[in-house]
Amino acid sequence: YIMSFDLTSLYPSIIRQVNISPETIVGQFKLHPLGEYINKTAPRPSDEYSCSPNGWMYRKDVDGVIPVEIAKVFYQRKEWKNKMMGAKRNQELIKKVLNDKKFGTIDKFTEVNVYEDFSDDMKAELLTYTEECLDKLMFECKHAEILGNTNQLNRKILINSLYGALGNIYFRYYDLRNASAITLFGQMAIQWIERKVN
């Protein structure tokens, strides 16, 4: 069998979950081979701190600046993605009415938030619009979908590129310990899944 797994925003999720940020590092612990952590045979270094596979420990009691900012952008992305999907679903409804070729006489559509799924009243109202009116509404929905997609992709790139920035010596929050903690956590997650599946 061949399987494909997509771990949603893996590195940003690791940063948030472990609270990886320069000001949250508290110290180191004795390392064990990565396989021992995957098999849960390595001793648990600390219950008080989040521990990374590269030996660094992070505070849990205070949110780090990097995880906080990633969370903000992550939720903005989710919001824009939902808007994009709403506009896309609305296009399908309009397309169905256009394909049925049974048009009404109303030539101006009601002001509606095209990012949100059309209400039942709006769905019924679609049947009363002229073809030109439906085309205009379709244009609005397509524009909203493109805007939503652009915004969610921009945020995806922003949060995913932050990991690379952490390993860049010119970045204000550069810290190789953090960059390697994220990488090793990612490797551990993939290897853990591989062992569970196999």
Question: For each predicted feature, which ranges?
Answer:
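Conserved acidic
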Residues: 1-198
